[in-house]
């Protein structure tokens, strides 16, 4: 297919030329009714913030320009079908899981998944078969799923309908996806890939394996993260063994009927950009990331991991564009360095946790920006270094799963002070955001270690979300008796 084409963009440009008089929504009427919005966003933007109409197609039932854009995306990603999504990759992940499972079904998955996965299990009332990942002894981060762990889970749960894989994790760690696909398919299970952080795997060279390229059945891809489209835009990819018509039915259960043409056109334009220029763009990103990694490691006390941690299994590969920097030898938590960078140096990184800082590099970064980050980290070491601190060094605590997320979330519950929750079954999520990986999920027993982790995270300034009590002083737990 001709990847230079941008059918949604072309249709919007034609609409502007035709000067159609709008007696439909949105009510700002191409910006004329809201001049402040037009000044802020610009006429070019508000003039194409329009409603679905025949020349522009309909996202819920595409037959013309949106269908053409989806066909081009499928071709670019080497998938059987692609769905343009406007609810973020949360909506892509949830549609993927809901398409693969029915109530009561089991799914094999790592516990270090995004909350959207567990929310989908809660909605469909599926049973999670968690594989607890190993943690790296120095970095404290959770790794990928080991092949033997998945093999044992498949043998113990032959009734499972699917295996879900993070490709990569938030920290850039990749499992042995080709082996997992082969193993799952041999057991007649689908393979679902959360590729929220792996768009570039499809277009760059010297990248980890992309899910569709190794035979996975579905993949949720965050185009807005490393693909250049607008925030909240995403693509759901399916393989030849998946009923795409059924998937669209599932998508339409929750997806808006007022799909934003700003988001849709950004997907169309960005897909073309990746297909035409992706190799060159990501070659430069890799060069910048490798340079930054080397410079940061030369500062001292920081550790930006590289290929030395690859072990052929739990770390089968890693995403070189991710700049994950361990800060513990500095005597500072990752979230503390994150805050200093933002507050003192006007540098916004992706996130900081208890031991690590993540800088997200893309083709939008300039060499001078990378130099500024490296220089700031060096100065932070000089100004704030305090070695010998007693630091919490693990980012993942294996949960004790007591009941399904669905059952726990809808059970009778009561609010209990955090300090008194040990041994109780949690009825809600607790997580740091970003990255949105639950510390606790509904149905998991609260342990003393988890309570200490939550208290420590709050003390270090992590943004904890999920509980009904936004201060996270109390947690909802299952009522006893």
List each model region and its residues:
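Conserved N-terminal alpha-helix of the aminotransferase class I/II PLP-enzyme fold
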Residues: 46-91
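Short glycine-rich or small-residue beta-strand-to-loop segments that form or flank ligand, phosphate
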Residues: 56, 83-85, 163-166, 324, ...
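Charge-dense polyanion-binding interfaces
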Residues: 463-481
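Conserved PLP-enzyme active-site core in the AAT-like
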Residues: 5-13, 17, 37, 61, ...
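N-terminal "arm"/small-domain region of PLP-dependent enzymes with the aminotransferase-like
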Residues: 1-64, 435
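Structural signal for conserved beta-strand scaffold positions within catalytic alpha/beta enzyme cores
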Residues: 84, 130-132, 221, 351, ...
